[in-house]
Amino acid sequence: MDSVSFFNPYLEANRLKKKSRSSYIRILPRGIMHDGAAGLIKDVCDSEPRMFYRDRQYLLSKEMTWPSLDIARSKDYDHMRMKFHIYDAVETLMFTDSIENLPFQYRHFVIPSGTVIRMFGRTEDGEKICVNVFGQEQYFYCECVDGRSLKATINNLMLTGEVKMSCSFVIEPADKLSLYGYNANTVVNLFKVSFGNFYVSQRIGKILQNEGFVVYEIDVDVLTRFFVDNGFLSFGWYNVKKYIPQDMGKGSNLEVEINCHVSDLVSLEDVNWPLYGCWSFDIECLGQNGNFPDAENLGDIVIQISVISFDTEGDRDERHLFTLGTCEKIDGVHIYEFASEFELLLGFFIFLRIESPEFITGYNINNFDLKYLCIRMDKIYHYDIGCFSKLKNGKIGISVPHEQYRKGFLQAQTKVFTSGVLYLDMYPVYSSKITAQNYKLDTIAKICLQQEKEQLSYKEIPKKFISGPSGRAVVGKYCLQDSVLVVRLFKQINYHFEVAEVARLAHVTARCVVFEGQQKKIFPCILTEAKRRNMILPSMVSSHNRQGIGYKGATVLEPKTGYYAVPTVVFDFQSLYPSIMMAHNLCYSTLVLDERQIAGLSESDILTVKLGDETHRFVKPCIRESVLGSLLKDWLAKRREVKAEMQNCSDPMMKLLLDKKQLALKTTCNSVYGVTGAAHGLLPCVAIAASVTCLGREMLCSTVDYVNSKMQSEQFFCEEFGLTSSDFTGDLEVEVIYGDTDSIFMSVRNMVNQSLRRIAPMIAKHITDRLFKSPIKLEFEKILCPLILICKKRYIGRQDDSLLIFKGVDLVRKTSCDFVKGVVKDIVDLLFFDEEVQTAAVEFSHMTQTQLREQGVPVGIHKILRRLCEAREELFQNRADVRHLMLSSVLSKEMAAYKQPNLAHLSVIRRLAQRKEEIPNVGDRIMYVLIAPSIGNKQTHNYELAEDPNYVIEHKIPIHAEKYFDQIIKAVTNAISPIFPKTDIKKEKLLLYLLPMKVYLDETFSAIAEVM
């Protein structure tokens, strides 16, 4: 008889007779009742949800006291002043029917409805606080001949129910300039329309725009207004001069909640942080049918959740495990036991409300863990979990923007939202910041932490879990280790500091930094500078700026491909596009849209940029200084100040904060150009984007012309850079061999290397002074010798005698297998570090087809051929390590979304599913090996040969040696193609022709031979 290993009060109905007010679906593995039993128990239960902790039973409720936590009561504060730090803010609405407990001073702001900004943070004493801010108006601007008719139109929109909400609003004349297009005069017939309710403002603004009104700034949200209009920080310290505590009828779940008017707040510049609480969590699921769990399937339940509670600084490390069924003790871990999945999830969310962390991290939690929990509570249990956020009527949810569904995983991401909580998923963070063959947690931990996960296979988890308390402890440890690793990754990369600095700089919330694109971060900055100049931003509708003329992108000069055994100097333009925009005053505010506006100006006051049949004109700084240019200058100046401050900073934490700040400034500067070129953005302007790239092309071409015409004699270098005849080893040859967007490659023959290295920065300064306007600056970056220039965007060069620089070659592509990379690297190393091979390569590249036939290849080339023969032997004799033969592709979307199903990585996933093995997630890099085809099937496609590497190793399946060797030949040819002589023979065929012939017999032939 099976032993009962878990007391379930619902199956022992007579033991507990108290009923809850509502019933719920109860789902639990049969194995937690009877060790080893398969399947699930599903029924409806009307008993109160509960949990067990250290052999004691606790009823689950929102207001319960959590047994393992010691929650201190808040202290009394001086009502006249308080200092606090905020990390998040949300906009909310309040209505007349909810003002019973609201102090009288603030009621008129929300009658009949109104905006309340809720700011979340910590007091200077470290207590969690919610600050309710009243009096922030939301507004837009509208052109209308008569203000009274505009008021009547808005009243009508409210009364007819199109807006479905009413609030107070005010219309007043406004005297503003438009940011878009140079205009010395203010906008005529302009009115500012202000609302007490941000939602109503946005809806009416959109309706007016659709009805043909010219409107401005309807896309500016109320939080941006709050930060920009008041000069407030979105992440930082505040003083509140006076406030009233919200003691009764709180809107938040925090101990300290206060009300104040927007004018009572004072933003402070202190960059230090208080101590914020963080969670790292991970979930384990049980797929009912052995497949990868789907949150919407009733039987695919969550069986465990691990939580590591820690702080942004310090060593606090508190470990919690939520589990179905009883579980053996795990040292240092608080274990909470539950009888059903609903109770486990409810307990987790109650714990979230009570401990109330400010930051939550994990690995792929946005796309899986949190999403899974939200879907289970919503779709399966129909339970609103918003009350477990920082607000009692808050929100916990996920969304994938509709327009992003088709983009694939790497471009789109699930947006997660919890009122007062910031999610910092380490999966997208590390995916964007490091290069790895795949981005599984185990791989990233090995690379970044030099740690490996203790493995528990996908198939073992269900067996262990239902085996008994000890098995559940094994699964629990496995679940906990993921959370522990993420904490270490979180503290290593310090992404939260970077997010905070971008938020402060861009006047946006930290949540916006994490989940929105660069446009949403640049837009408030432009709004801020425009406001300073009494300018307003037009709200764009579909127009010529959105449809746009096509404009030519960045220039890449046709490379003079070849193997260069002489030094090649590489120059870079510093911050090219921002520099062009500053140097030439390119901006919305300087763009000439109406020639009548410049009738009184001379041509010397105007920059004209010609692009084929199109011409764009901009006024120069003497007429109006560019808004974008001012922003860029300020940011770059701040970055220089921050970097200088870093040099003198001895405090490690302060130095880290300063580094994140300078990085935020750099990223923001580089994003401005992209905002103007985004066709469907908030402020698109093809004229600016096209002019920037056009001027960039002109700069590149003028540099090439100057070098190839002026810098060709020894006399020039002696006069300009102080060289003497001893600095030259023969007739000087200087030539630009390649130009790529913001880089220039200049080959220099017959100059002493040390002399060239000494004057290279001087050459960059000389060209800058002769050709460009400030702040455009050409800088010396490096010298490459030798250099293999393969084609556009692809080259290999040696820097500083030992460092190899690769760009665009198979050696660094994620899709190439390690074996191919290893062979290519060995051959490249021969070309760059073996003088005999270098000499032979130069000779080989100049040989004719006749010379090849008569003389054969130079001796040094035989070293390359020998390495290829060794690789061929390893492959055809099955001596190559399968782990080094793994190819990979990213599962960028759900399998059903692929139009082409016959892809190698999809074939592997289907094989895994057939064998009921663990299925990868969207976004994972799928590893596979090409196996040998059946006899006679030489033309088999890759998708038919692709197999999971572990399966190949386990079953000792032979690999497809011919395909792998073919990959090697192609990769080597691509990497070293410039050393091949110019013949009629294709380079791949020539390389194969140079290799000695050898026949390899397969196992079938060998067996026949043995019999005979």
Curated annotation (Swiss-Prot):
GO biological process: DNA-templated DNA replication; viral DNA genome replication
Regions annotated as coiled coil: none
Major location category of this protein: host cell
Catalyzed reactions: DNA(n) + a 2'-deoxyribonucleoside 5'-triphosphate = DNA(n+1) + diphosphate
InterPro entries: DNA-dir_DNA_pol_B (IPR006172), DNA-dir_DNA_pol_B_CS (IPR017964), DNA-dir_DNA_pol_B_exonuc (IPR006133), DNA-dir_DNA_pol_B_multi_dom (IPR006134), DNA/RNA_pol_sf (IPR043502), DNA_pol_B_thumb (IPR042087), DNA_pol_palm_dom_sf (IPR023211), DNA_pol_type-B (IPR050240)
Signal peptide range: none
EC numbers, comma separated: 2.7.7.7
Acetylation is among the record's keywords: no
Cited PROSITE patterns: DNA_POLYMERASE_B
GO cellular component, one term: host cell nucleus
Keywords of the record: DNA replication, DNA-binding, DNA-directed DNA polymerase, Host nucleus, Nucleotidyltransferase, Transferase, Viral DNA replication
GO molecular function, one term: DNA-directed DNA polymerase activity
Gene3D superfamilies referenced in this protein's UniProt entry, alphabetically: DNA polymerase family B, C-terminal domain (1.10.132.60), DNA Polymerase, chain B, domain 1 (3.30.342.10), Helix hairpin bin (1.10.287.690), Palm domain of DNA polymerase (3.90.1600.10), Ribonuclease H-like superfamily/Ribonuclease H (3.30.420.10)
Location within or outside the cell: Host nucleus
Highest taxon, organism lineage: Viruses
Family: Belongs to the DNA polymerase type-B family.
Entry protein name: DNA polymerase catalytic subunit
Species of origin: Human herpesvirus 6A (strain Uganda-1102)
Phylogenetic placement of the source organism: Viruses, Duplodnaviria, Heunggongvirae, Peploviricota, Herviviricetes
Underlying gene: U38
